[in-house]
Structures are given as structure tokens and as C-alpha cells.
């Protein structure tokens, strides 16, 4: 949005000069003044306290619902991708040998393919789920039909059943939790964290570079993060 405002301002200066030199009759960019509003950022409820997050992980560990929901809940904290990307995860996107989940650009918010390093814990969760849904397309198929993935509200509904209100935790909140706790650890480059979250990086050249940058650090960070989640689940950071 800031880039759009700057472009309008530049265009307005060009047209004002054109009017002053009799090359134009008016400044059409003036019509956009005040029309370019910044969209309201939607914040999703998330748990960012380590002890409280550990308690959530223990509740997830004890969850006894549908297997697709149960394993999606277990995997979500480890990979911290957007809920839509997680629920539509396909077996064809998972490379067990290279320990990576490659999300195609068509599923990504930024329309760029995104590689997610998989920790030993994440691979173990997927290995267990493969015994249940490996013959189908989706990692987390719907309980009604294996031809579709679980719905977009399934994870949120499970969180409500576990006693977490929408003001406390959401499916999208796993991303906020990871971002907050990883940054607070002070162990990782903030750019590597942002890349793991697949956040937009300004500038086309930087975006191309950023796609492959920090991969080694991201792999190490993914394993550290999963180990840290295990520690929290077992009662660490009390």
C-alpha cells in the first residue's frame, strides 16, 4: 500500500508539471487522494507464552478425535504454515528422503512455491498418517470422503472442543506462536524466520534470492523448534 501511495504522489507531481507547462489540462492522480486506504490487518488469536503453549501441546497430544484432525493438530505446530496449506497437504508434495514439503505456488498466498524443511518429529507424524491415508491424494482427508481434504474450519472447531476460545487460540495462531517464540529465542536470523513463514519480501530481486536463502539455517531451525516443542510439551520452561 505504501508503494501505491508513493506511485500516486509521483504521478501527481508529473501531471502538475504537465499542467504548469501546458502539456496537460488537469492532474487525474488527485482523484485518488484519500481513496487509497490501508486495509485493516486481521490479527489471529495465538498463545505466545511458552508454558501456556506447552499446555496446549499436551492437550493436543491427548486429543482423541478423527485421525485426520488429530494428526493435523499434531503437525501444525511443527511446520507453522497457513491453515489452508496444511489442510490441503498432498502426499505428492512430501519428500520423505529429502525431508521437505514443497507447497506448489497455486496453494500459496504469495503465488510462489514454498519449501518447508521437515524435522524428525514432523516426519514421524507424517509416517504414522501415511499408514492411514497414504493410498489417497490428501494427507488429511475428510471423514466424509477421501477425495477431499478436511474443511477450512476443522482445526478451529477442534480447538474449541479442547476448551480454547477464538480469543485464545486459532488455527492460524500456530504461525504467530512460532514467530514469537523463535524470535524471542534469539538463536535465529529474523529473515530466516520470515522465510519459513513464507512472508512477502519486498523487491523482485530480493524475492528471487530469498527463495533459496537461509535454507541450511531453516533446516537447523526446524529441528531445534521441534525439539523445543517436545521440551515444552513435557513441562519445560515452567
Put a short name on every predicted segment:
Residues 43-45, 61-64, 105-115, 142-147, ...:
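Short, contiguous acidic/charged loop-to-helix segments that flank catalytic cores in large enzymes
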Residues 9, 16, 91, 184, ...:
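Residue-level detection of the helix-turn-helix DNA-binding "recognition helix"
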Residues 47, 102-111, 123, 187, ...:
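Catalytic-site neighborhood detector that most strongly recognizes the C-terminal catalytic loop/helix
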Residues 7, 14, 89, 158, ...:
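Residues in the recognition helix of alpha-helical DNA-binding motifs
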Residues 58-70, 79, 116, 124, ...:
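Short, basic (Lys/Arg/His-rich) helix/loop patches that form interaction surfaces
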Residues 1-12, 20-88, 97, 108-112, ...:
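Basic, Lys/Arg- and aromatic-enriched nucleic-acid-binding interface segment
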Amino acid at each position: 500500500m505504501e508503494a501505491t501511495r508513493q506511485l500516486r504522489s509521483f504521478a501527481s507531481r508529473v501531471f502538475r508539471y504537465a499542467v504548469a507547462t501546458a502539456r496537460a489540462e488537469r492532474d487525474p492522480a488527485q482523484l485518488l487522494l484519500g481513496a487509497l486506504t490501508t486495509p485493516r490487518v486481521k490479527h489471529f488469536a495465538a498463545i505466545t507464552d511458552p508454558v501456556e503453549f506447552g499446555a496446549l501441546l499436551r492437550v493436543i497430544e491427548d486429543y482423541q478425535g478423527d485421525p485426520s484432525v488429530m494428526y493435523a493438530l499434531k503437525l501444525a505446530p511443527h511446520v507453522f504454515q497457513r491453515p489452508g496449506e496444511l489442510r490441503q497437504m498432498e502426499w505428492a508434495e512430501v519428500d520423505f528422503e529429502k525431508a521437505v514439503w514443497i507447497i506448489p505456488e497455486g496453494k500459496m498466498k504469495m503465488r510462489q512455491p514454498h519449501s518447508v524443511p521437515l524435522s524428525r518429529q514432523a516426519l514421524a507424524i507424517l509416517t504414522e498418517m501415511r499408514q492411514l491415508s497414504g493410498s489417497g491424494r490428501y494427507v488429511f482427508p475428510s471423514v466424509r470422503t477421501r477425495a477431499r481434504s478436511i474443511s477450512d474450519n476443522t482445526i478451529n472447531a477442534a480447538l474449541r472442543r479442547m476448551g480454547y476460545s477464538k480469543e485464545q487460540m486459532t488455527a492460524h495462531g500456530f504461525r504467530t506462536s512460532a514467530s514469537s517464540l523463535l524470535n524471542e529465542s534469539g538463536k535465529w536470523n529474523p529473515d530466516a524466520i520470515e522465510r519459513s513463514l513464507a512472508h512477502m519480501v519486498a523487491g523482485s530481486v530480493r524475492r528471487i534470492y530469498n527463495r533459496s536463502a537461509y535454507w541450511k539455517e531453516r533446516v537447523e531451525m526446524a529441528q531445534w523448534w521441534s525439539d523445543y516443542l517436545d521440551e515444552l510439551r513435557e513441562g519445560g520452561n515452567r
